[in-house]
């Protein structure tokens, strides 16, 4: 399609209300936020799964328990992420359900408002009051109804019978409806119908009309009316592209009430005919020609009866078509909300060769919609809306042409007098051809892509089978190659050894002496290595001691790990709190599911009402057939009575009386119609209130969604905080490992200092032993000297005089030596053999 035929985006978007666009944008934003949350959760999961176990390579024995703590943390994180994924899945389910509810509330359509005063006119007027278009009214209704039938047949039988129709193929019906609505909104009214033809048009288009008509311009009576989809101004709903099932059911009920009214009218007519029969039986022997005025009135009655039968047939057909539409729309309520199918912008860029290619392949009309095609259509769903409306317009004009052909085949007499200039319809004929070519090109492109996909899947399956067959062969070949390489290496080594042995054997005599020398050197080196081995064993013993010391330091670190475990307990408490919040979210989800079940129950009740309506329709059809048979009998009797009625003036008076009675009955019926219209308006107000309540519920669901998204963000923040805590713990583990190395170095230094101190203590103990030995010798000398002094005192008196001075001298000398020894010995209890009196005198004598 050339870009010149594209409508302006504003013109197309003008038919769509701004509320509908705003709500769709809100739904898209909610879905985008949910997809972002899901992607972030997947990224968190991947980052959490790919976290390296830090600090496990260098010192495994020192970090066994930190590894276990990290594993516990990772398990907790994985469980928390699994719970989070479940909550996100539940949130996505709630979002999908809310989007369905939003689509249902967006698709609000008012019930059809029929012009009851014009559609149910059963009064008997003379021929002077009749318009010229009464003869054209019946074929117009036929043509309009045939157009509705062709539309429904095209929407029903879109695929060939050989192909299996998937459930997604029913989207074409909705696309056709959308195309019809866009064409009706965008096409200017070329020739509107006359005011006398409005009831038939409203009746024939009741499948697609759910709002009162706009202003219509009158046409002169001589000009015929072309019943094309673009010429008729059919208003469509303001709130969406799809009809609401509740409104359709209400329209079915309204039409059923009209049928009952028509039945009542027919019963009244039959009663009048029975009165005619009674009058005719009294005056049956009189046979005269009818008066012209009576004949004209009776012809008008016949025409009115024919019109009533046709209108009843039209009503029954319309009700059946509405029920078929309802049966189609019920399974599509869930799928259409998810599949707002928009075509790609590539439709604008088709070349002339591609158009020619599409014209050649006109026979291949329909392609089964597969899951891949649906994904492609979803991928291109962000295209502008005017491309979709243009393509739907092209599709619908193809169906209009088929409907026009069907109209011409049924009623050629009505279309002979229709003459309009051809120049007005040239662009309308060019547009469908190009749209047909583009549609066929897209269908062929989809078919080729499907065939390529099938081939690719078959080749991939064959490749997988061959790979599975090749795997054991590859393993066996690799094992054989490895064995051959090993054998070749062995053969090479054996050949080299053989050559070396031959050379050695040739030089054995010369090298024996050198070998003996080398053996001696080897023995000497062996002895040296034995000494080194002993040294290494001693070093190993020292290392074992150091290992014990390290174990003690590890015990010290375990105490620190207990603290970290207490911190982990705090984290577990936080996790339990998060689990409680998740359970609360689950309860809210259960409430949403209960509400969904209530909605499903309401739909089930609607289906039951539909089945009852269908049974009532069947009964009404049977009654209509019986009434038709009765009317035929009555008409035959009327023809026999006409000759007798003309002769009697009394019969004229009775006919006038019956006419007055019919007018009175007509007035009563009109009053009843007014009451029914009032009841209908009250029912419409009730339905509007229910729709408002549904909108408020959707707003509540949106708020719940926003709260759930906020809670998901809070959960993601908590996960990020836990990750940060893990990183902090890892850094602390690094610090602890560094401190362990420092402690090890300090322990090695302390061991060296300890060895030095032990050596120093041993030297001090040796000195102590030597001093004790000297003290004992001095005590012995002291005792011997005291004995000598006592013996000398006993021997002579002179010696007694001098002995006191000598005793004091020796006492002072011993006290001095004891004081010098006490400077090296801080404890006085170790001085054995010294008298207590001398020990008490020491400070005074040292001061002297």
UniProtKB/Swiss-Prot annotation:
Residue numbers bearing the Phosphoserine modification: 620
Coiled-coil residue windows: 442-794
One of the record's GO cellular component terms: nucleus
Compartments (UniProt record): Nucleus
Keywords: Coiled coil, Nucleus, Phosphoprotein
Principal subcellular localisation of the protein: nucleus
Source taxon at top rank: Eukaryota
Region span, Disordered: 41-62
Name of the protein this chain belongs to: Coiled-coil domain-containing protein 110
Organism per entry: Mus musculus (Mouse)
């Amino acid at each position: 399609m050339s870009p010149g035929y594209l409508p302006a985006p504003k013109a197309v978007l003008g038919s769509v209300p701004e509320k509908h666009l705003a709500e769709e944008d809100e739904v898209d934003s909610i879905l985008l936020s949910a997809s972002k949350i899901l992607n972030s959760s997947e990224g968190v999961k991947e980052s959490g799964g790919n976290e390296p176990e830090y600090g496990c390579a260098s010192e495994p024995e020192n970090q066994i328990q930190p590894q276990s703590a990290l594993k516990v943390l990772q398990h907790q994180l994985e469980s928390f992420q699994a719970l989070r994924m479940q909550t996100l899945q539940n949130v996505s389910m709630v979002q999908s359900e809310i989007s369905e509810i939003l689509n249902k509330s967006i698709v609000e359509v008012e019930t059809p408002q029929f012009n009851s005063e014009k559609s149910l006119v059963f009064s008997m007027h003379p021929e002077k009051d009749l318009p010229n278009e009464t003869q054209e009214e019946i074929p117009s209704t036929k043509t309009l109804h045939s157009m509705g039938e062709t539309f429904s047949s095209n929407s029903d039988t879109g695929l060939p019978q050989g192909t299996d129709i998937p459930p997604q193929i029913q989207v074409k019906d909705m696309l056709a409806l959308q195309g019809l609505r866009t064409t009706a909104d965008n096409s200017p009214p070329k020739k509107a119908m006359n005011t006398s033809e409005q009831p038939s048009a409203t009746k024939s288009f009741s499948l697609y009309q759910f709002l009162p008509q706009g202003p219509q311009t009158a046409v002169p009576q001589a000009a015929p009316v072309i019943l094309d989809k673009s010429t008729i101004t059919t208003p469509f709903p303001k709130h969406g592209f799809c009809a609401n099932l509740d409104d359709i059911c209400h329209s079915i009920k309204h039409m059923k009430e009209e049928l009952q009214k028509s039945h009542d009218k027919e019963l009244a007519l039959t009663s009048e005919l029975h009165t005619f029969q009674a009058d005719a039986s009294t005056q049956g022997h009189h046979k005269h020609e009818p008066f012209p005025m009576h004949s004209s009135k009776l012809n008008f009655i016949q025409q009115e009866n024919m019109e009533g039968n046709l209108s009843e047939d039209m009503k029954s057909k319309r009700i059946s078509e509405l029920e078929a539409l309802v049966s189609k729309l019920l399974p599509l309520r869930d799928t259409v909300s998810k599949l707002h199918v928009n075509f790609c912008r590539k439709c604008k860029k088709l070349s002339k060769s591609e158009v020619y290619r599409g014209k050649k392949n006109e026979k291949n009309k329909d392609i089964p919609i597969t899951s891949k095609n649906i994904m492609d259509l979803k991928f291109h769903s962000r295209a502008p809306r005017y491309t979709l409306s243009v393509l739907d317009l092209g599709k619908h004009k193809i169906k209009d042409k088929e409907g026009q052909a069907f109209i011409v085949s049924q009623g050629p007499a009505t279309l002979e007098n229709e003459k309009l200039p051809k120049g007005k319809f040239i662009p309308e004929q060019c547009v469908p051809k190009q749209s047909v070519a583009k549609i066929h090109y897209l269908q062929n492109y989809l078919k080729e892509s499907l065939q390529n996909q099938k081939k690719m899947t078959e080749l991939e399956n064959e490749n997988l089978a061959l790979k599975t067959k090749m795997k054991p062969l590859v393993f066996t070949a690799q094992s054989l190659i490895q064995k051959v390489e090993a054998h070749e290496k062995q053969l090479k080594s054996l050949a080299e050894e053989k050559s070396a042995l031959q050379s050695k054997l040739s030089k054995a005599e010369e090298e024996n002496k050198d070998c003996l020398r080398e053996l001696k050197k080897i023995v000497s080196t062996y002895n040296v290595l034995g000494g080194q081995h002993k040294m290494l064993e001693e070093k190993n013993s020292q290392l074992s001691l150091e290992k014990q010391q390290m174990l003690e330091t590890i015990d010290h670190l375990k105490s620190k790990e207990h603290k970290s475990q207490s911190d982990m307990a705090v984290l577990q408490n936080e996790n339990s709190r998060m689990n409680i919040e998740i359970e609360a979210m689950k309860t809210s989800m259960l409430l949403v599911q209960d509400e969904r079940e209530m909605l499903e129950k309401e739909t089930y009740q609607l289906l039951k009402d539909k089945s009852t309506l269908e049974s009532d329709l069947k009964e009404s059809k049977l009654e209509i057939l019986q009434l038709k048979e009765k009317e035929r009998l009555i008409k035959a009797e009327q023809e026999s009575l006409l000759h007798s009625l003309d002769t009697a003036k009394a019969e004229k008076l009775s006919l006038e009386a019956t006419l007055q009675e019919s007018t009175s009955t007509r007035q009563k019926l009109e009053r009843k119609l007014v009451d029914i219209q009032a009841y209908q308006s009250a029912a419409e107000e009730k339905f509007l209130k229910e729709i408002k309540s549904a909108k408020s519920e959707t707003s509540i669901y949106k708020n719940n969604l926003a709260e759930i998204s906020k809670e998901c963000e809070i959960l993601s923040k908590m996960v990020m905080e836990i990750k940060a805590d893990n990183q902090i713990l890892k850094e602390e583990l690094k610090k602890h490992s560094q401190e362990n190395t420092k402690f090890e170095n300090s322990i090695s230094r302390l061991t060296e200092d300890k060895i030095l101190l032990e050596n120093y203590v041993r030297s001090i103990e040796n000195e102590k032993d030597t001093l004790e030995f000297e003290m004992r010798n001095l005590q012995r000398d002291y005792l011997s000297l005291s004995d000598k002094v006592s013996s000398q005192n006993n021997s002579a008196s002179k010696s007694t005089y001098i002995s006191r001075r000598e005793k004091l001298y020796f006492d002072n000398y011993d006290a001095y030596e004891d004081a010098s020894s006490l400077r090296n010995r801080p404890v006085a209890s170790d001085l054995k053999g010294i008298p207590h009196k001398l020990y008490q005198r020491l400070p005074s004598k040292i001061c002297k």
